[in-house]
Amino acid sequence: MKLSRKKFAFIIGISFLVTIVVGLLLPESLVIPVKGATRADWNSKSFWFHPWGKSGVHKGIDIFAEEGTPVLAACPGIVLYTGSNPVGGNFVSIMGPKWRVHYYAHLKTVNTRGWTFVRQG
């Protein structure tokens, strides 16, 4: 059985739409991603586009801990990319529920690789 281009495009479109909707419907329950950290360990003034250093704006939460403290996944997801850059040092980007990307930076080491699934915590 050979599919016409229209049917094939329709199937691809529906599959894409279902994937988007399912991603948005997945529940998101976050945990603090630094082992042993509490709400008292982050800088609430650095949240939501607060000016931060040379980068100008900063969207996220900085959680402070001793060097070498394990950093865990705030939610389950797929590792999109790992690497290093001058601003964030060693980092990991994870796509979680609701299509949100979680960026973990300033890591001493990275113990995962791209396109792997990680569990929360």
Where are these regions (language model features)?
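Short, basic/aromatic beta-hairpin or loop at an interaction surface
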Residues: 53-55, 94-103
